[in-house]
């Protein structure tokens, strides 16, 4: 016969669960499905009774053993199963039953009484309902309250749908919300690391009165410390009885006299404080990385009803936001791109020295361009180990790479004599010859054949490219407009360029950085 596990399923435990696990599961389920916390819906009442019945059987070792063996604790059903088993073993003429009905005695407790007894609260069984410090009544004759009160009738001043006792170790507390904050950091701060101070406004339990609102509490005489009042009314031959929250103590069962009110929190049980937190940003931290300060959130939160509720403190979650850097961009967490490295035409052809300022390390980066290595406009070169600090599985592992994008600035024109010299030099270069030999249009004979294929050829000399008057004209070709804008931009940039200093450009840069600096890196660059 397959084992019946419906009682275990009600508590959401397995059949092999220990007594402590069953007790813990019952506590959580009873608090979750208690009718007072679910607006006394029919589903919550049914579920609560089912949970209590399951716990009443499974907490008792003898009843649990019977349930595990027979799948029920009903005396009649068990006797039938025993008789059937004996008939199968001894034959059809044997019939006897040694079932002990003593194990089937149940305490006369309602679900509300069982719930109150489990949480060490006073409970008084009643034919109309269960009256306890939880004030759960099945007759639902009045709007019930739900307050946790310990055996001595003491609770704190936090009240919403429930009043929590700060001294009840078995009481379940919800986790409070996290406090979120954004921390803006520059690229240099992420490279070097930093320590920031964060001012946080939060609500904490009063350390003087431990959340009770006073050092001395008095028992409410109206409800005699129960937190509830029972009233009766005679209607002819019938007597109606109902329970409601005590109006004098608010259901707490106790109150604090004015002379005993805690001066630190003024009887509230909590205080608002401003905490200065030290936030450490590790070197190599990334954009949108989280820093979690565990348990630094609010210990008391406000409820929708205007009250306050004690909670498990949430965390302070800080999100790192990297500010935009004008010169560098981070890719793949640890690599850097230098977006604006301008070099002149001569350096791109003949080599030289290029300096990069503003590196997040605070160092001046010196790049030696090898003569003969032509730098094309927009090309990338790699400087190893000059990126951001790199981490692998949380362990620091060197640095990323620095990728430099070169922007070549061309002169407006060259002197004809120098242009002729450059042409003669380039014509005899073996690399130029090899490249020209691979181009179909490099040979002049090809141009001759091209000219012969046309009836007429007009020959012109380029002049200054002047932008047309666009006041009364519409240009439909977007490429022409882009070409004009690019030409004007280059013309303005080259107008500021002093042609007399072209030959002394490298010497000027060396003189510029001759003063002492905090650090100086000299690197060769590699192809990207």
UniProtKB/Swiss-Prot annotation:
Record's subcellular location: Cytoplasm; Nucleus
Region (Disordered): 485-528
Single biological process term from Gene Ontology: protein sumoylation
Gene Ontology CC annotations of this record: cytoplasm; cytosol; mitochondrion; nuclear inclusion body; nuclear periphery; nucleus
Presence of keyword Secreted: no
Keyword Metal-binding applies: yes
CXXCXGXG motif repeat coordinates: 206-213, 218-225, 246-253, 262-269
Zn finger intervals (CR-type): 193-274
One Pfam family this sequence matches: DnaJ_CXXCXGXG
InterPro entries recorded: DnaJ_C (IPR002939), DnaJ_domain (IPR001623), DnaJ_domain_CS (IPR018253), DNJA1/2-like (IPR044713), HSP40/DnaJ_pept-bd (IPR008971), HSP_DnaJ_Cys-rich_dom (IPR001305), HSP_DnaJ_Cys-rich_dom_sf (IPR036410), J_dom_sf (IPR036869)
Further comment: Present with 125 molecules/cell in log phase SD medium.
Name of this protein: J domain-containing protein APJ1
Species assigned in the record: Saccharomyces cerevisiae (strain ATCC 204508 / S288c) (Baker's yeast)
């Amino acid at each position: 016969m397959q084992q019946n596990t419906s009682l275990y399923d009600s508590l959401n435990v397995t059949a092999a669960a220990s007594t402590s696990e069953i007790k813990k599961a019952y506590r959580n389920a009873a608090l979750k499905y208690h009718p007072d916390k679910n607006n006394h819906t029919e589903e919550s009442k049914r579920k609560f009774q089912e949970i209590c019945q399951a716990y009443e059987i499974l907490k008792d070792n003898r009843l649990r053993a019977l349930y595990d063996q027979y799948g029920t604790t009903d005396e009649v059903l068990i006797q039938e199963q025993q008789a059937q088993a004996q008939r199968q073993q001894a034959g059809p003429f044997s019939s006897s039953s040694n079932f002990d009905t003593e194990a089937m005695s149940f305490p006369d407790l309602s679900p509300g009484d069982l719930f109150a007894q489990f949480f060490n609260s006073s409970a008084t069984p009643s034919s109309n309902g269960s009256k306890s410090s939880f004030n759960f009544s099945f007759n639902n004759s009045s709007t019930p309250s739900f307050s946790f009160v310990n055996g001595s009738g003491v609770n704190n001043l936090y009240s919403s749908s429930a009043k929590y006792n700060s001294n009840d170790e078995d009481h379940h507390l919800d986790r409070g919300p996290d406090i979120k904050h954004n921390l803006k950091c520059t690229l240099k701060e992420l490279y070097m690391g930093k320590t920031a101070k964060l001012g946080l406004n939060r609500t904490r339990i009063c350390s003087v009165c431990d959340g009770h609102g006073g050092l001395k509490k008095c028992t409410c005489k109206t409800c005699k410390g129960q937190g509830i009042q029972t009233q009766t009314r005679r209607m002819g031959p019938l007597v109606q009885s109902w329970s409601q929250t005590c109006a004098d103590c608010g259901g707490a069962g106790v109150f604090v006299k004015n002379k005993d009110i805690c001066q630190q929190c003024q009887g509230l049980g909590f205080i608002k404080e401003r905490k200065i937190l030290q936030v450490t940003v590790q070197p190599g931290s990334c954009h949108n990385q989280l820093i979690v300060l565990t348990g630094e959130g609010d210990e008391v939160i406000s409820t929708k009803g205007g009250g306050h509720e004690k909670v498990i403190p949430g965390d302070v979650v800080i999100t790192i936001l990297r500010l935009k850097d004008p010169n560098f961009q981070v890719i793949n967490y640890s690599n850097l791109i230098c977006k604006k490295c301008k070099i002149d035409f001569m350096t791109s052809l003949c080599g030289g020295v290029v300096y990069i300022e503003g590196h997040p390390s605070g160092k001046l980066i010196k790049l030696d361009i090898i003569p003969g290595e032509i730098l094309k406009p927009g090309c990338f070169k790699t400087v190893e180990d000059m990126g951001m600090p790199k981490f692998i599985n949380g362990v620091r592992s060197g640095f990323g790479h620095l990728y430099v994008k070169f922007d070549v600035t061309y002169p407006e024109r060259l002197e004809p004599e120098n242009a002729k010299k450059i042409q003669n030099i380039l014509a005899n270069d073996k690399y130029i010859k090899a490249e020209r030999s691979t181009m179909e249009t490099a040979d002049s004979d090809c141009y001759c054949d091209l000219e012969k294929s046309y009836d007429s050829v007009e020959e012109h000399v380029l002049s200054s490219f002047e932008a047309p008057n666009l006041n009364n004209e519409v240009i439909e070709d977007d490429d022409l407009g882009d070409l004009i804008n690019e030409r004007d931009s280059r013309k303005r940039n080259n107008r500021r360029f002093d042609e007399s200093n072209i030959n002394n450009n490298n010497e000027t840069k060396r003189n510029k950085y001759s003063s002492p600096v905090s650090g100086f890196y000299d690197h060769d660059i590699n192809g990207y």
